[in-house]
């Protein structure tokens, strides 16, 4: 079995450099990015942008491109009186979340009301190559029990509207307001998956297939399984750690399925409990093991995931990177833990913004970008 390729999409928040409040400047930032040759996509609200990488076989190359994209887009934001933050929800009180002015996004806003207008949420999507749609559906079944662990590991949305939410990933709680969001159902075949999507389309639960927001799904545009469970991680290193773990889990799933096995059908109720626990506690508290309902420390469940995917990590050449990246993350905390520390007893939102700004551009030396000249037509993101 060939090593699968991997690609990543990251969503970012644009904020005012002085106040940290979201700024509605995504079209201007995308215009500047286009002049610099950066493919930057618009998201549902005008406070958000999305980057996407090329397809990579090598994790080191993925790391380099993600870092360069963050550095470049940060310069474009700076040129338009904005700051780029890798954070899954706004830490400050937003004045508004105006919807990006495209026909599709206007239709979504008209159909879903306040859910759309409060959408300023940023995630990270990892695409891993699979041979066909049937394989993607079966791999999704295998991934279901591990999705809460991936959420806990990368949680980056503890502070919202000037308050400590008490959750590591408040984004994941808000995100589930969409009728098509959350854990993917268990499907016996790709035909069953397609039948469910057809029902959702005919009922108006989704307006198009791009709005099937399950946390793992066959990609619409690429021959991949797309894993969408994560908050946008605070640092490039954490994003690449996520990508490496997702790729290894997909590779493990394909080996498992090739041996004639069938993924366990974890009950939706157990999976929802595991999701809630992951959102609440992140990597620092307890977790629910979806396969058997055990309650155990999240780090112990992480060890079980690592043990499961270790042969794949070795085969793909990613074991060393994952070991080093996890050691660093667990030593200093993930994005949510660092937000809470910065917020502290003084409820210092400015310190949270400073922490996020530094983490977003780790390894960068951003400089002001020049704007002007030419015409660039921005592209919608994948919401």
UniProtKB/Swiss-Prot annotation:
Coiled coil: none annotated. Keywords: ATP-binding, Ligase, Nucleotide-binding. Its EC number is 6.3.2.2. It catalyses: L-cysteine + L-glutamate + ATP = gamma-L-glutamyl-L-cysteine + ADP + phosphate + H(+). It is an enzyme of class 6 (ligase). GO terms for molecular function: ATP binding; glutamate-cysteine ligase activity. The keyword Ligase applies. InterPro entries: GCL_type2/YbdK_subfam, GCS2, Gln_synth/guanido_kin_cat_dom, YbdK. SUPFAM superfamilies: Glutamine synthetase/guanido kinase. Pfam families: GCS2. GO terms for biological process: modified amino acid biosynthetic process. Gene3D superfamilies: 3.30.590.20. It comes from the Bacteria. The keyword Glycosyltransferase does not apply. Belongs to the glutamate--cysteine ligase type 2 family. YbdK subfamily. NCBIfam families: gshA_cyan_rel, PRK13517.1-1. ATP-dependent carboxylate-amine ligase which exhibits weak glutamate--cysteine ligase activity. PANTHER family: GLUTAMATE--CYSTEINE LIGASE 2-RELATED. This is Putative glutamate--cysteine ligase 2-1. It comes from Nocardia farcinica (strain IFM 10152).
